[in-house]
């Protein structure tokens, strides 16, 4: 018998039937072509996995009877906010997808000086919604049951004035390497765009309590740097191990 895993924004309760939301129903019915009796693992972001069976499946609505639930054990022990400068093409999308797989807690798209993307407020909102769907898909694939929030794009100066974290790190390929010491309760990780943050932005970050972090002698692309940084932090303080 086939089994699938899907996100639904609807409330989920054991021994109750749930009509899945439009996104989940469309994917299950039209892409995966589920049938009555197929097993599903459903999550809604509350940290639990809900198991059940499809009781009805039409082109527009899939319903599932939830029969059991258990807490997910896939969340990182680190509370990490990734502030990543927006980049052109699909590089930003790829980066946030992989960051989700690596356990990031939240994502903030940053509009720094060297970000070469100009959109209207309406298009930025659509971008934010699209990025959130990418994160949801990454959670479905990776087994996560808590969905990282993708914030509205914001300027670097605004984010720096608002962010709160025990450990604040900004990537800088010119920084002096230093060791990571005691495990923090929360981390804010700032990564610039192609070409890096402007010198004035690095200075502003340091003035707001950030420490420079260097990831080795090579210059990493803007979509590669988050993966390396999150892997280093996860191996040092989190649940990434060999």
Regions found by a protein language model. Give the residues of each.
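Glycine/charged-rich beta-loop-alpha catalytic/anionic-binding loops adjacent to active sites
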Residues: 18-20, 77-81, 186-188, 207-215
């Amino acid at each position: 018998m086939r089994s699938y895993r899907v996100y639904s924004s609807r409330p989920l309760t054991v021994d109750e039937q749930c009509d899945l939301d439009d996104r989940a129903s469309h994917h299950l019915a039209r892409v995966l072509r589920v049938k009555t009796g197929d097993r599903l693992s459903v999550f809604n972001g509350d940290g639990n996995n809900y198991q059940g069976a499809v009781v009805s499946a039409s082109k527009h609505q899939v319903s599932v009877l939830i029969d059991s639930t258990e807490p997910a054990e896939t969340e990182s022990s680190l509370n990490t906010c990734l502030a990543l400068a927006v980049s052109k093409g699909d590089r930003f999308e790829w980066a946030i997808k992989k960051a989700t797989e690596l356990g990031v807690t939240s994502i903030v798209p940053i509009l720094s000086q060297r970000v070469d993307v100009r959109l209207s407020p309406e298009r930025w909102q659509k971008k934010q919604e699209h990025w959130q769907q990418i994160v949801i898909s990454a959670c479905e694939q990776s087994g996560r049951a808590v969905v990282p929030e993708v914030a509205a794009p914001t300027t670097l100066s605004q984010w720096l004035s608002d962010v709160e974290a025990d450990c604040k790190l900004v990537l800088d390929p010119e920084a002096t390497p230093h060791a990571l010491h005691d495990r923090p309760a929360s981390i804010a990780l700032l990564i610039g765009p192609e070409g890096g943050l402007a010198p004035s932005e690095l200075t502003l970050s340091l003035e707001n309590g950030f420490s420079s972090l260097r990831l080795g002698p090579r210059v990493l692309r803007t979509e590669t740097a988050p993966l390396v940084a999150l892997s280093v932090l996860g191996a040092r303080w989190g649940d990434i191990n060999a």
